[in-house]
Amino acid sequence: MNDVKGVMLFSFTGELLFKEFVSPLSEEPEKKDWWRLFFLSLNKVNEAELVFEKSRLYIRKTELGFLMILMGCFAPVAMVRLNCDILIPALKQTTTMSGLKRFFMKNIL
């Protein structure tokens, strides 16, 4: 999808299960020890969108943990949600996380 920068899947305890980014990060996300606290603070939140000056972070609760999608300002949020709706049920049935790469496919329209 256009303007999607990265995808991460974390367990409920803050362990990084999967990550994929368009370009390398300056600091690896698994080096942060506050992910568990962050996810605990989400408590019963199923979906959240955090908006920053130059980017957005879409967070979706799954049965495995939290799916986080890092986007630029112009990413189509409706398409991100739709892809999550399709992807999340499939995560339960697979042992690989290759389906998460769908966020990096270009729209053909």
Can you describe what each PLM-predicted range is?
Residues 1-6, 11-109:
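Acidic, low-complexity cytosolic segments
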